[in-house]
């Protein structure tokens, strides 16, 4: 079973103004597999990241759920944070929410948090793999763009195969 840590961010007042952060922490800390849950004003800050790293080490966390603002803004931040603490960077889930009504927003936050916890329970670490690469290209289409692409690739020293569905190459240019 995973040992999951839940980290709920206030995002200053952005989240805390519309979500009862304490209620979210209380609801999520009793979920199966959760061994640590806390909240902090800015999880993306250096001190917030240290809270995450310290908890991973202290509690032996195998996965984390970060309830914060948009993954678009901070996914890389949190991925690096958990990796720096020795956790696989893909063993984390991030959820965010938007609502005006505090009760609805809090309910949604709890549901999203539970969903993220369930997902982390099932996660398996991703590992790097290498595959042999054949340095050869296939160009589909024998029009002028396909021909030029094939020539450019060949000029760069790679083998090229070009396929065309018609019996001749040149596309519309051959009709001029």
Language-model region placement:
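Residues forming the flavin
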Residues: 1-176
């Amino acid at each position: 079973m995973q040992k999951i840590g839940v980290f709920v961010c206030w995002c200053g007042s952005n989240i805390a103004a519309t979500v009862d952060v304490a209620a979210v922490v209380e609801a999520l800390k009793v979920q199966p597999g959760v061994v640590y849950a806390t909240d902090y004003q800015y999880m993306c800050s250096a001190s917030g990241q240290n809270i995450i790293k310290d908890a991973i080490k202290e509690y032996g966390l195998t996965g984390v759920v970060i309830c914060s603002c948009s993954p678009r803004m901070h996914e890389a931040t949190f991925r690096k944070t958990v990796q720096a603490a020795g956790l696989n960077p893909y063993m984390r889930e991030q959820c965010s929410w938007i609502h005006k009504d505090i009760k609805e927003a809090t309910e949604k936050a709890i549901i999203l948090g539970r969903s993220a916890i369930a997902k982390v329970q099932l996660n398996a670490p991703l590992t790097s793999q290498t595959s042999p690469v054949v340095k050869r290209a296939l160009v589909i289409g024998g029009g002028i763009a396909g021909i030029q692409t094939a020539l450019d690739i060949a000029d760069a020293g790679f083998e090229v195969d070009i396929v065309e569905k018609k019996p001749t190459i040149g596309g519309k240019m051959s009709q001029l």
